[in-house]
C-alpha cells in the first residue's frame, strides 16, 4: 500500500473547497489590528488572539527592530548550547517577577511548551488528569509522556474526583487544565480543582495561554483572578496572544524549572526564540505592566459584546455567557450551515472563526469570536449588526 494513498482520498477539506465555503488560510495584506486588509478588502477582525492590541504598539514594534539590528534574525542553536541570549535571561527574570514564580523556562511556541513540560514531568509511574476541553497541545504532551492519562467531563468536579480516586497512593498525579478555555471562553473551576488536588496529593498545572493579560491583578492570569497563585504549581503560557509575539513559557519553582530544562526534549533539541520575538515579548510584558488599565478595558468590551449579541438574538454558549473573557462562542449547530454563514459574514466585512470538531466537542459547532482592548464600541456595533443580519434575520 502507498503511504500517500490517504492524501488522494476524498476529504472534508476538498468538499468544502468545491462548495466554496472553505474557511481557512485567508491571506492578510496588513498588520494584525482591529481592522485588517484581507484578500483585498477591509474587514473587522473578530478572530484574533491579539487581546491587548500590542502587535502594533510602537514601543513593541521598535523593540523588535532594535533586536534585529543588534542580534540578527536568529540564534542558530538550542538554549542548551549557543542559543541563549542575555535577552532570554532578561525575559525570564522579568516574567518570573510578574508572575511571582521564580523558575521560568521559555520555549519556541506555546504548543511546544505544553508538550515539553508534560513529557518531562510525567513518567510511566505517573498519572496526568485532563479536562476534556483542554487544548490539543496538552493532549500531545500526554501522548508523548509515558504516563497514564485520565480525562474528566468539562468542568465536572465530581468526575475529576473519581479520576483522582483511581490514582494509587504510590503514584504521582498532575491535574492539567486550561485556565480560560480557548474555544468556549469559560474559566476553569480552579478553586475546586486546587482543593481536590490538595485532598488527594496531586499537583496542578494551568495552561494560561488565554488568561495572561486578560484575567487577574494587572493581567497576571487565572490563578491571580481567583487568588490562588500559591496553590497552582505550574503556569504555562504563550507570547503569541496578549504579549504580541511568538513563543511560550513555563513558570514554577526553581527546582521544577531546572528539572524541565535538563529533561525536556522539545526544549533541549529546538532552536531558541529568535531575537525579535524575544524582544517584542519583553516589550509587551513591560507595556502591560505600565498599562494595567488594558485588561480592564478588554473586560469592558467583552461584556459589551456579550450583551450586544444577546440583545440582537444571537445564541452564546451558556458556559461563556457571564465569563469576563474576550472569547465569545456563538452556537450555529450544523457544519455546513456554520461554514455558509461564516462565509457570508466574511463577505460582508467581518472576520470570525468557524470552529468544528475536533477543536470543539463532537456535535458542537460554533463561530468563535474574540476581542481586543483596542476595539471600539462603534466598531463592535458595526460587526454585531452584520452578524445578526446573517445569523438571525436571514436564517430565521
Segment roles from a protein language model:
Residues 117-136:
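Conserved PLP-anchoring active-site segment centered on the Schiff-base-forming lysine
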Residues 3, 58, 62-66, 70, ...:
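PLP-dependent enzyme catalytic core of the Aspartate aminotransferase-like
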Residues 5-73, 202:
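N-terminal "arm"/small-domain region of PLP-dependent enzymes with the aminotransferase-like
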Residues 296-303, 310-349, 359, 364, ...:
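Conserved PLP-binding catalytic core of the aspartate aminotransferase-like
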Residues 272-291, 297, 310:
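Structural motif of enzymes handling amino- and sulfur-group chemistry
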Residues 150, 154-206:
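Active-site phosphate-binding strand-loop segment of PLP-dependent enzymes
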Amino acid at each position: 500500500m502507498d503511504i500517500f494513498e490517504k492524501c488522494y482520498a476524498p476529504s472534508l477539506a476538498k468538499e468544502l473547497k468545491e462548495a466554496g465555503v472553505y474557511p481557512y488560510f485567508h491571506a492578510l495584506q496588513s498588520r494584525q489590528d482591529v481592522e485588517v486588509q484581507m484578500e483585498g478588502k477591509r474587514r473587522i477582525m473578530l478572530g484574533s488572539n491579539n487581546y491587548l492590541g500590542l502587535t502594533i504598539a510602537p514601543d513593541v514594534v521598535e523593540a523588535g527592530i532594535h533586536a534585529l539590528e543588534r542580534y540578527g534574525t536568529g540564534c542558530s542553536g538550542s538554549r542548551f548550547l549557543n542559543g541563549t541570549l542575555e535577552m532570554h535571561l532578561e525575559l525570564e527574570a522579568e516574567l518570573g517577577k510578574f508572575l511571582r514564580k521564580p523558575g521560568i523556562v521559555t520555549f519556541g511556541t506555546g504548543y511546544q511548551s505544553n508538550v515539553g513540560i508534560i513529557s518531562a514531568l510525567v513518567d510511566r509511574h505517573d498519572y496526568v488528569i485532563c479536562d476534556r476541553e483542554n487544548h490539543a497541545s496538552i493532549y500531545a504532551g500526554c501522548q508523548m509522556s509515558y504516563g497514564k492519562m485520565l480525562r474528566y467531563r468539562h468542568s465536572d468536579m465530581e468526575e475529576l474526583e473519581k479520576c483522582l480516586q483511581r490514582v494509587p497512593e504510590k503514584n504521582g498525579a498532575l491535574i492539567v487544565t486550561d485556565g480560560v478555555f480557548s474555544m468556549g471562553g469559560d474559566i476553569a473551576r480552579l478553586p475546586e480543582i486546587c482543593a481536590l488536588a490538595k485532598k488527594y496529593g496531586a499537583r496542578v498545572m494551568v495552561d494560561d495561554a488565554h488568561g495572561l493579560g486578560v484575567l487577574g491583578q494587572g493581567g497576571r492570569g487565572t490563578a491571580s483572578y481567583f487568588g490562588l497563585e500559591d496553590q497552582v504549581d505550574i503556569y504555562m503560557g504563550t507570547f503569541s496572544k496578549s504579549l504580541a509575539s511568538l513563543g511560550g513559557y513555563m513558570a514554577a519553582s526553581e527546582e521544577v524549572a531546572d528539572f524541565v530544562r535538563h529533561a525536556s526534549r522539545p526544549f533541549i533539541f529546538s532552536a531558541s526564540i529568535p531575537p525579535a520575538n524575544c524582544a517584542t515579548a519583553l516589550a509587551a510584558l513591560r507595556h502591560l505592566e505600565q498599562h494595567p488599565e488594558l485588561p480592564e478595558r478588554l473586560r469592558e468590551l467583552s461584556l459589551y459584546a456579550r450583551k450586544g449579541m444577546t440583545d440582537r438574538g444571537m445564541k452564546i454558549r451558556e458556559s461563556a455567557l457571564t465569563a469576563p473573557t474576550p472569547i465569545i462562542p456563538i452556537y450555529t449547530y450544523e457544519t455546513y450551515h456554520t461554514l455558509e454563514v461564516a462565509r457570508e459574514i466574511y463577505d460582508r466585512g467581518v472576520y470570525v472563526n468557524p470552529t468544528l470538531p475536533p477543536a470543539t466537542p463532537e456535535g458542537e459547532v460554533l463561530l468563535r469570536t474574540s476581542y481586543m482592548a483596542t476595539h471600539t464600541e462603534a466598531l463592535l456595533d458595526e460587526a454585531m449588526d452584520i452578524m445578526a443580519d446573517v445569523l438571525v434575520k436571514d436564517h430565521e
